[in-house]
Amino acid sequence: NPDAIKDVKLFKGAIPSRYGGRVSSVLEIFQKEGNSKEFKMSGGIGAVASRLLAEGPIIKDKAAFLIGGRASYAHLFLPVFDIENKAYFYDLNTKLSFTINENNNLYLSGYFGRDLFAISDRFENTYGNSVGNLRWNHLFSDKLFSNLSLIYSDYYYGLELDFVGFKWNSGIQNFNLKYDLKHYLSDTFQLNYGINNIYYTFNPGKIVPNSPDSGILEDQLIKKYANEFAAYVGAEHTLSEKLSLQYGLRFSYFMRLGQDELNVYENDNPVIFDPFLLVYQEATPIGTISPDRGERLATYTNFEPRMALAYTLDPDNSIKMSYTRTTQYLHLLSNTSSPTPLDVWTPSGPFIKPQLQDQYALGYFRNIDEGTYSFETEVFYKDIQNRIDYIDGANLIANNAIEQVILNGNARAYGLEILLRKNTGRFKGWLAYTLSRSEQRTPGREPVEDNGRSNKETGINFGEWYSTPFDKTHDVSLYASYDLNKKWSFNSNFVYQTGQPTNYPVGKFEFQGLTVPFYGLRNQERLPDYHRIDVAATLTPKKNAGRTWQAEWVFSIYNVYNRMNAASINFRRNQDTGANEAIRTSIFGIVPAVTYNFKF
């Protein structure tokens, strides 16, 4: 809910040492603390979605509350446009703030959100988060303060397949205890340091029949457990008026803990390579063990250095460069090209190594015409070890031995980002363009003793680099806004992205009376390119003197030219002609909306 947000920061290149556990960018979100002096309310009522936020004092200047919610209902109007799909979301933000004394503050906040989308009567996908956070802020002095946080998070992912006859869900629960300190040693030197510990419970999946006569038996996959500890120190150092540095080190220690049952494999290798068929296959377990919950199945230790430099060439020009190492101990198992999307998280362990990323970036910034315009560009390169992929025909759903279909490989991503802004005047806007590649090679080319694979294996796509599902060669965003007068303003944006890599059948064969498709090299085809235009007009009525009520009307059209962008492409046989045909699955077309925003 944007009304509940105080500030947002995105870290793509130079990620501070206080953040870890992921090899992607970091989005830092600061929630409002609630107004302790007076009651305020804001919100918006629209044809597609509505939102409401209320905040105010419980005890003036001592305690405050904040509560806000959002919900969308665009799916109610989709049948008007002959669209049988559904897509909606709802969420709730809450926060209580208490000022104990001038040196101590206590905060209790919560978040609950759900997203749902369904494709006709084929499947329904639901996912979301529930988060609770108790934080104690303590001021030791005007130069040192700390935050002690106890956080609970519950991630849920559900999939209902009516044509199969079952509901499936998975998720992660974690308890996070973290202690962060910020120390201003001088006007030019600042230290950040702290520790945190996360205990994970993974639910790989639970199957529940959606009707008594479905023929499906209820089944709970074996839950997995892990613990992740980290300690960090980071410095922000201004060396001169022109040169500033950010540097730090993060230490992480991950333990995969015992579970009810674990397979044992010959040579500890759950995936074998058939040199005659040139395919990877699931290895047959040679036994099982039942380790205690507190037993360590695998441990990993990593040091993650961070370094960033910013140098001002002159008042209008500056350069920056950074190096970041991050480690991710959790792996997302996702079949993004499937017509029924699937997301499952699994921890690193005896057979699955953590991902290690080294990222390098070099950027240039320039102010033009005394800040009227600005220009930014950055080149980056990422090297990732132990990025996972799957063997052909991998079963990701209801699989208690997921290690039998996973291969560790390497990945790389590199590209150029350009951003041109107009910052002042009645006409403002920006143009952003990214040229990039995201590729992987599976298995990786480490020595045999490091990855447990034979150097005689061909690898996926014959051991060559191939596109990851996240590869977007071209990514263009264009935004423009124009303030016509004090009442009317207009804005529009255009988005274009190269289509997502996917797999299409290259042939078929008959097996026991069934037509079975077969595929060529992995991720060699792409979905159609994604693009759309959105427009909006905002009417701000004249504010009445002496009234605190402020309001505006927003008239918008999402996807003006009704582009039915493909979420996936599915192949089927036409029942009338018998011919094979490709079916595009899309979520939204054109969506007009009117929203009334207010605050007081």
Name the predicted role of every residue range:
Residues 147, 151, 318-324, 330, ...:
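Membrane-embedded beta-barrel scaffold of Gram-negative outer-membrane proteins
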Residues 487, 495-514, 528-534, 538-600:
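C-terminal beta-signal and adjacent terminal beta-strands/loops
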Residues 46-73, 82-116, 124-148, 152, ...:
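Transmembrane beta-barrel wall of Gram-negative outer-membrane proteins
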Residues 380-383, 402-506, 597:
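Gram-negative outer-membrane beta-barrel transporters
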Residues 41-47, 67-71, 108-112, 148-154, ...:
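Transmembrane beta-barrel strands of outer-membrane/channel proteins
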Residues 1-38, 51-53:
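A beta-strand signature from Gram-negative outer-membrane beta-barrel systems
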